[in-house]
Amino acid sequence: MRYKIVIEYDGSNFIGWQKQNHNSNSIQEILEKAIFKFSKQHVTVYGAGRTDAGVHALGQVAHFDLTTDFETYIVRNAINYHLISHAIAVVHVEKTDTDFHARFSAKRRYYLYKIVNRYSPLTIDRNRAWLVHTPLNVENMIKAVCYIKGNHNFSSFRAKCCQSKSPVKTVDNLSITYNHPYIDINISAISFLHHQVRIIVGTLVECGKGYFPPEHIKTIMEANNRSYAGTTAPSYGLYFVKVDYS
């Protein structure tokens, strides 16, 4: 029986989604151990997105297989019982066909990046948003968005260690909402390059600081060179919001 689960987590104290060794503090391995504790079955949990260390999730999707046909509420409650000491929660469980794959069946992934633009330190949003002290010109950031949306070669916006075969991606939506001092950047695509969202955010922030005009984003894009783009925004401001499968 294949189970599809939706997971929420605070990524602050984890090395990221993907397990790296048998004793790693990864979300994937912690989930696998929790499932084993209630089912006595060794499973592999496949996630829709391999979030980095510090990245949070509101709606990460994953799947795994069990030989036992449990009621979905039992699966949810049992996993959460064994996650009680971790900042991870299973918020939804459903049974699905065996041809469903959390990663490869995904049609669109949605991310949110949170910025707080003020001089005072963060309290409630500490490790949950990027604190930018310099006043940002949000209007210029919004103007820059049009140069990023659409189908492009995103070589300037990928990490050097990115293993994706092609740098060409399609950003379906990129929008910025501003309610001083909070800036939310929402972005969606079928898939992303390694650090693509965080480099886009870092570049938009540099535009907002006045380092370059909005139209300079086009030059950065055409350069196909990581050194032309801005800094990689901190991981703790990034949230994996949800996944579409239709």
Curated annotation (Swiss-Prot):
Its EC number is 5.4.99.12. GO terms for biological process: tRNA pseudouridine synthesis. GO terms for molecular function: RNA binding; tRNA pseudouridine(38-40) synthase activity. Homodimer. NCBIfam families: hisT_truA. The active site is at D52. Keywords: Isomerase, tRNA processing. Transmembrane segments: none annotated. This is tRNA pseudouridine synthase A. It catalyses: uridine(38/39/40) in tRNA = pseudouridine(38/39/40) in tRNA.
